[in-house]
């Protein structure tokens, strides 16, 4: 095997299975394994080119006759806040954010379970155990971090880690930006639009 062949990823296609987004449709995915022997630039380009990461697998939709799923990249310098986006930011001014190492905790998993049970109880992640969650957070060969969102308590003497956890975003650092891998949040406060807020906060 030549060095060029070794560095070039092998791609695979999954068998058709029910689409989790569009009823009555089938989905397929194109995927490749991310391994330490692959050049970092190659992995970076895959993620910038529309592939998503799940642990050490990069994948993208590969469905026949359907292109409804679109990977979105935001050009930060060209982005302009709409009125609705400003309202979302205003509604969450009482939150703090920290960028922390990708280390799973029981507190995170409890919020993750509440989110999955409320939003995706019939989805592919519904049966994830605490070990599965830990692997999702820790199993990465790229530069990964967590964005941790907590409610500001107003008590400067209280450790920040004691404040209520409102959301978590698992992110990868790329050469020209950030890729949000997965996020979850407190679903009991819909007026906050926390999913939208976390995207805006990263922008």
Model-derived features: where do they sit?
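Histidine (H) residue identity feature
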Residues: 33-36, 120, 202
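Conserved acetyl-CoA-binding loop-helix of GNAT-fold acetyltransferases
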Residues: 191-203
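Terminal substrate-recognition subdomain of acyl/acetyltransferases
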Residues: 1-103
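A conserved beta-strand-loop-helix scaffold within acyl/acetyltransferase catalytic domains
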Residues: 54-65, 71-191
């Amino acid at each position: 095997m030549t060095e060029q062949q070794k560095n070039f990823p092998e791609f695979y296609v999954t068998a058709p299975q029910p689409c989790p987004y569009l009823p009555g449709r089938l989905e397929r995915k194109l995927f490749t394994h991310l391994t330490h022997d692959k050049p970092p630039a190659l992995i970076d380009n895959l993620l910038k080119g529309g592939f998503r990461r799940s642990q050490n697998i990069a994948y993208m939709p590969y469905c026949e006759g359907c292109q409804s799923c679109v990977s979105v990249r935001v050009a930060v310098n060209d982005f302009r806040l709409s009125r609705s986006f400003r309202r979302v930011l205003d509604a969450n001014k009482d939150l703090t954010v920290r960028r922390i190492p990708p280390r799973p905790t029981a507190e995170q998993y409890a919020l993750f379970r509440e989110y999955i049970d409320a939003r995706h109880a019939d989805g592919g992640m519904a049966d994830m155990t605490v070990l599965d969650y830990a692997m999702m957070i820790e199993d990465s060969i790229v530069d990964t971090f967590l964005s941790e969102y907590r409610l500001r308590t107003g008590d400067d003497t209280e450790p920040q880690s004691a404040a209520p956890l409102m959301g978590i975003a698992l992110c990868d650092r790329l050469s020209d930006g950030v890729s949000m891998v997965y996020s979850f949040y407190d679903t009991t406060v819909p007026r906050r639009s926390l999913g939208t807020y976390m995207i805006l906060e990263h922008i």
